[in-house]
């Protein structure tokens, strides 16, 4: 799977999860599948370059990126490394893109085929970036740590975010730039 869109992240992440699950029973199959997926994922990660802009907009950033960060977490948990995927050029910088796409209306700045509705429960994918960077800008505390009665229905991978929230340790607090531009397949300026 070597396409350059979010389906790459979804499929290769799933193949890695399945391979980890069967590794004790069939280590050769697991190893070859993981290698193939590790070779394929960079094709999708290239789309974040050079500055973190995701060409399909913020909604698809959330969809594809959550599968990347879950995959990175699985690899770290199983092998002690994510094999460099989390440090792929412009991947970590893409968290700033996501934050900058939050419009004053409370929705997302809408471009490409991106929807504009934000989850009221906070951005669990940004929690991974907060845990890795220590930057409070990516920890949506007021949206992530609400009372259970206000949370409502969780999304498919929100449970993984509890680990990242537990791992978060504030080491820095950056602020939003007054001007930002990002290049790539769908350049933008904010």
Residue ranges and their predicted role:
Residues 1-57, 163-179:
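Active-site lining segments of carbohydrate-active enzymes
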């Amino acid at each position: 799977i070597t396409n350059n869109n979010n389906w790459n992240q979804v499929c290769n992440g799933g193949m890695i999860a399945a391979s980890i699950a069967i590794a004790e029973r069939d280590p050769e199959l697991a190893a070859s599948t993981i290698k193939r997926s590790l070779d394929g994922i960079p094709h999708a990660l290239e789309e974040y370059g050079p500055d973190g802009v995701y060409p399909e907009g913020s909604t698809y950033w959330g969809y594809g990126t959550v599968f990347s960060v879950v995959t990175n977490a699985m690899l770290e948990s199983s092998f002690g490394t994510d094999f460099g995927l989390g440090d792929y050029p412009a991947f970590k910088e893409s968290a700033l893109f996501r934050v900058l796409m939050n419009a004053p209306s409370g929705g997302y700045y809408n471009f490409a085929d991106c929807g504009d509705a934000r989850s009221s429960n906070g951005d669990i994918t940004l929690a991974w970036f907060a845990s890795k960077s220590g930057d409070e800008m990516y920890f949506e505390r007021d949206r992530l740590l609400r009372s259970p009665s206000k949370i409502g229905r969780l999304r498919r991978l929100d449970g993984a975010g509890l680990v990242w929230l537990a791992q978060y340790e504030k080491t820095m607090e950056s602020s939003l730039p007054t001007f930002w531009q990002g290049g790539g397949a769908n350049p933008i300026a904010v």
